[in-house]
Amino acid sequence: MSVSANAAQAHAQPSAVLRPVMILAGGTGGHIFPGLAVAKVLRARGVPVTWLGADGAMETRLVPQHDIPIDTLAISGLRGKGVVKLLGAPVRVMRAVRAAGFVLRKRQPRAVISFGGFAAGPGGLAARLLGAPLLVHEQNRAPGMTNKVLSRFARRVLTGFPGSFVGEEAVGNPVRAEIAALPAPADRLFGRTGPVRVLVLGGSQGARVLNQALPAALVALGHSEVEVRHQCGEKLRAEAEAAYAQAGVNASVEPFIADMAAAYAWADLVVCRAGASTLAELCAAGVGSVLVPFAAAVDDHQTRNAEYLVGANAAVLLKQDDSLPVRLQQVLQTLLADPARRLSMANAARTLAKPDAAERIADIILQEAGNGPSGMGNGHSSEQPQERTLMHADKRTDQVSVAAGAQLHTIPDSRFPIRTSTGGAR
C-alpha cells in the first residue's frame, strides 16, 4: 500500500517556533468543520495548527483554504469492505500508523486531537505510541468507530452531546460565532406577522427525500401563508425546482446558503437532517425544527442525535419512509397554525446551546499540552518546513521516503523514523 503525506502549505518560520497542535479529522464535513472552528480559536491565540487527513478526501480541499498545513495518509474506511480487503486491513493499518508516526516526528505537535475520520485512527495510535497528549472530540451521540478506539487511551474525551462515553466531558459542538450571536427567540419571533417562514436544509449534497416530501406536504395542506426557502445542494437544484413547480408551491430554491446566521434569523421553523453540526446550529440560533434523520447514516447516529432535541421538546422527529409526506403534512399543519408552539420549541433549543464549545475545546487542548515539555520533546521546534514535502511508501521495498525539492532521503522500514538534531526526520 502506498502511504503519502502532502504538506499542502508551509510558511517560513523563525528558528524557534511554538510547537503546533495537530488536528486529526476528515472524510465528512461533520468531522472537518468542528476541527476548523477549533483551529481558528487556537490560531487567534497564537498557537500554530497542523492537520492530518486522508489522501484525496474532502479535507485536502477544505483545509488548505484556511492556510493550515496538512499531511495526508493513504487510508480508507473498513466498513462495507470485502473479506479479502478486511483480511489485509491489519497490515494496511500498521503501515498507516508508521507513516503517521513519521508525520508526528516531523511536526512535533504539543498535543493531538481527533475529531474522527479515516486518518484519525492511525494518527491517534501514533500519538499514543510517541507519547503526545491525545484528546478525542466526538460530535455524535452514537460514537464513530475511530473515536471509540481512541477514547480508551485518550487523556480527555470531549463530546457534542451528553451520554456518548463514560467519563466524557460534554462541551458541545463548535458553531460559527455569528450564529451564536443571534438575538433570543422571543426577540425574533414574538409578534412576527405575515407568512410562516420555513427553512429547508438538505446539506451540501442535498437530500432527495426532502426535495420530494416538502412540496407534496405543502400542496396537500393548501396553505398559502407559507414562505419556503430550500437549500438543496447544487446537484439536486433542478430536481427541487421542478418538484415545487409541479406542486404549484412558490419557493426560493438555493444550492448553497452563504450566510446561515441570516437564514436562521429569518426562519420560523426549520426542516432538515440531523447531523451533529446542524443540530448545534439550531440550538445556538434558537429555532424549532422538524428532523428527518438520514436513514443510511452509520449506526443510525442521526436518529440518536435527533432524539436529544426531541427529548427537550425542541424538535419533532420523523422517520424517513414511504409515509413521510403524509406525516410531514400532519406535523406542518399543527406547527404552522401554532406560533406559541414554535416559540416554545425555539426557546427549548436555545437552552441546549453551547455557543462557547470551540473556546472550551481549545482551553482543554492547551491544558493538556501545557506550556513546556511533553512526550514529544521540548515546547518549541526549530524545524524549517520545506515549501512542499511528499512522503510515500515504495511498494517493492516497503520503505518510506521524503522528497523535499530535488533532495530525496530514504528511511528504512522501521516502527518510526529517525529524528534529526533539528527536529526533522531523515
Swiss-Prot record:
Q: What's the encoding gene here?
A: murG
Task: Return the EC number.
Answer: 2.4.1.227
Q: Name one GO biological process term.
A: cell wall organization
| Reaction(s) this enzyme catalyzes, per UniProt | di-trans,octa-cis-undecaprenyl diphospho-N-acetyl-alpha-D-muramoyl-L-alanyl-D-glutamyl-meso-2,6-diaminopimeloyl-D-alanyl-D-alanine + UDP-N-acetyl-alpha-D-glucosamine = di-trans,octa-cis-undecaprenyl diphospho-[N-acetyl-alpha-D-glucosaminyl-(1->4)]-N-acetyl-alpha-D-muramoyl-L-alanyl-D-glutamyl-meso-2,6-diaminopimeloyl-D-alanyl-D-alanine + UDP + H(+)
Q: How does it sit in the membrane?
A: Peripheral membrane protein
Region of interest (Disordered), residue spans: 369-388
Q: Which keywords does UniProt give here?
A: Cell cycle, Cell division, Cell inner membrane, Cell membrane, Cell shape, Cell wall biogenesis/degradation, Glycosyltransferase, Membrane, Peptidoglycan synthesis, Transferase
Can you tell me which family this protein belongs to?
Belongs to the glycosyltransferase 28 family. MurG subfamily.
Cellular component (GO) terms are:
plasma membrane
Give the UniProt subcellular location, in the record's own words: Cell inner membrane
The Swiss-Prot or TrEMBL record annotates one GO molecular function as: UDP-N-acetyl-D-glucosamine:N-acetylmuramoyl-L-alanyl-D-glutamyl-meso-2,6-diaminopimelyl-D-alanyl-D-alanine-diphosphoundecaprenol 4-beta-N-acetylglucosaminlytransferase activity
Residues bound to UDP-N-acetyl-alpha-D-glucosamine are 28-30, 140, 176, 204, 257, 302
Q: So, what pathway does this thing act in?
A: Cell wall biogenesis; peptidoglycan biosynthesis
Q: What is the top EC class of this enzyme, as a single word? A: transferase
Question: What name appears for this protein in its UniProt entry?
Answer: UDP-N-acetylglucosamine--N-acetylmuramyl-(pentapeptide) pyrophosphoryl-undecaprenol N-acetylglucosamine transferase
Question: Which organism is this entry from?
Answer: Xanthomonas axonopodis pv. citri (strain 306)
Q: What does this protein do?
A: Cell wall formation. Catalyzes the transfer of a GlcNAc subunit on undecaprenyl-pyrophosphoryl-MurNAc-pentapeptide (lipid intermediate I) to form undecaprenyl-pyrophosphoryl-MurNAc-(pentapeptide)GlcNAc (lipid intermediate II).
